[in-house]
Amino acid sequence: MTIASTRWEREKEKDMKNYEKYKVGYFMPPVCEMTWVKKDHIDQAPIWCSVDLRDGNQALIVPMSLTEKLEYFQFLVEVGFKEIEVGFPAASETEYEFLRTLIEENRIPEDVTIQVLTQSRDHIIEETFRALKGAKKAIVHLYNSTSYAQRQQVFRMEKKEIIDIAVHGAQLFNHYAQTMPETEFQFQYSPESFTGTEMEFALEICNEVIGVWQPTADRKVIINLPATVAMSMPHVYAGQIEYMCANLRDRENLIVSLHPHNDRGTAVADSELG
């Protein structure tokens, strides 16, 4: 055997073991009954919310201009969407002006509810509610990072500290909504990177936020469970959703929302199974 062939064999063996770097980053729930397996079809229409103007826009190399955003919003209305996420108004002047234009020029149909996104940070929440001044109704979407990796490597925080961030943001939502009685608000919370979060912790932090908002049958809270990074086969995500739905407090007064990204090419399967 030549030196060259020996080296080739070593490189081949190394490449074949390349899969080992992909560690399991998700967490299975403590109880996973997978009752959804018994369903062979979806028998109830979901509520569709377009996130193209926010999440889709972030994916573009050159984000949409104000004019393009207005045209796209009108297109989504014509398609028939009744909930449309219009952006992250505290993120940039364009995002802010887009929202203000929709409100001030009365471009939002009576049967359409706009949605905006905000991190759980004081000044961003304040700016977000300011941008909504004059809106007839709106969904305000709060999020903060909860995954094991982000807690350990980015924020270097304990679980209690992460919960405090979410709860404080939820309390600010209550405060600002009370100052704007002319607007009909619906609140939404996301544990960002839900799929990389321990399920017991995801449940705990969601329940803490729900406790602050006190949903009712007439004022339901949305709990969004995103696959911010797709980490598993679809049945794992479905098991995670099943666990959350079975254990969230005030479940009858909640709307559970799914937001799967397509990193693994399984976003549609994630949505249907979840």
Q: What are the language-model segments listed below?
A:
Residues 2-122:
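N-terminal capping/small domains of soluble enzymes
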Residues 3-5, 14, 49, 186, ...:
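Generic secretory/membrane-interface signal
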Residues 19, 48, 64-83, 99-105, ...:
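Alpha/beta enzyme core
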Residues 60-61, 158, 259:
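A generic structural signal for short
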Residues 86-91, 116-117, 190-195, 226-230, ...:
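Conserved short loop/turn motifs at secondary-structure junctions
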Residues 262-274:
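Thiamine diphosphate
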